[in-house]
Regions:
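Class I S-adenosyl-L-methionine-dependent methyltransferase catalytic core
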Residues: 1-157
Length: 157
């Protein structure tokens, strides 16, 4: 797990809240974040990854680590968000910074009602994105050029 992402996972509020929670990890990459959530007590982690080799690797690693609470979804994240009918207690997204559509990810999450009330969506992004005017924006944490924007499902966020 990368140091910057570990800082977010280590946030005391989020770690305590992971016990028996359902988590969605978008743009799974190597699966490190999914494995961290799973090892910290999440009851189910859905890891969405489009690249076949990455999805296969994550699936294999989860099996090797004995993490039967990790489900790998081999799918394009944007298409997945359109068809997903589940609700989650935490959603984390670490998209490639150059990906088209990064700015619209929060709107997709909230327009499809994917979070339980009071739960968080965390988006990792470069500093040239500013989500502070989004109606569900809560706070931003910065580590050098890496930014994490936190959004809440509550209307009063």
């Amino acid at each position: 797990i990368g140091r910057r992402s570990a800082v977010v996972v280590d946030d005391g509020h989020l770690v305590a809240g992971l016990q028996q929670r359902k988590v969605l990890d978008l743009f799974g990459g190597t699966g490190a974040i999914s494995f961290e959530f799973a090892s910290r007590g999440a009851s189910r982690v859905y890891c969405v990854e489009m690249a076949p080799a990455h999805a296969s690797f994550i699936r294999s690693q989860a099996r090797d680590f004995g993490l039967d609470n990790v489900t790998v979804v081999h799918h394009n994240v944007f298409d997945f968000l359109e068809i997903c009918t589940e609700k989650f207690d935490l959603i984390f997204a670490d998209p490639p910074y150059a990906i088209d559509g990064l700015a619209g990810i929060p709107d997709k999450i909230f327009s499809h009602d994917l979070l339980h009330p009071g739960c968080y969506f965390i988006l990792e992004h470069p500093g040239d994105f500013d989500f502070s005017s989004h109606p569900h924006f809560v706070k931003e944490r910065c580590y050098g050029n890496v930014h994490f924007s936190f959004f809440s499902a509550d209307e009063e966020a």
